[in-house]
Amino acid sequence: VNVRDDGYTQDRSSERVAAALGAEAGDLVVDVCAAPGGKATALAGAGAHVVAADLRPKRVRLVAGNARRTAADRPDSGAVWPLVADARHAPLRAGVADIVLVDAPCSGLGVLRRRPDARWRITANDVDELSVIQSAILDASAELVAPGGLLAYSVCTLTRSETIEVAERFADTHPGFEAVAPPEDPWIPWGSGALLLPQADDSDGMALFTWRRPLS
């Protein structure tokens, strides 16, 4: 776990996801599952403006609080606009975003070093149900990506069902989206995306897949 320059405490894996998106000043980013706000505030720190959505009002208030605290230490940061919304039905215009981040709800099996109880709480059926939700969110989020924009899917788990299989289903149903080459070391290739392994990066386990929407 690291403490960023703006004082926000965040696992290294989440920082690496935000960095891999390459957000620039003035970009419009939609983070559809934003709570507690670590990735959203990191992207705003790069100068991007971020719509930070989450399903539950309490979770969105958490994002808003973290955005206020981090912005106080970063006068040049982009705006963070909290939004209560179901990621499967976000009330946003199609093609609105330069970058859409789907940091989807998942089994959390990549964070066993911090939450070992998940080893006994999460069942195979849970993983299967989560993968259906993940695919639905990813499909809906693709509609928000502007031509030439980036769609990113990340989960703090290492199960094949929630990573490679979700990515393969998306690629099969969205042939116009082109897989982007995965980031380099310490990421390791995993299907069309990449993994961070706890033992290799001293971080949570994380998977990342990214696609580019064609210009036309």
Regions flagged by a language model, labelled:
Residues 1-216:
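S-adenosylmethionine
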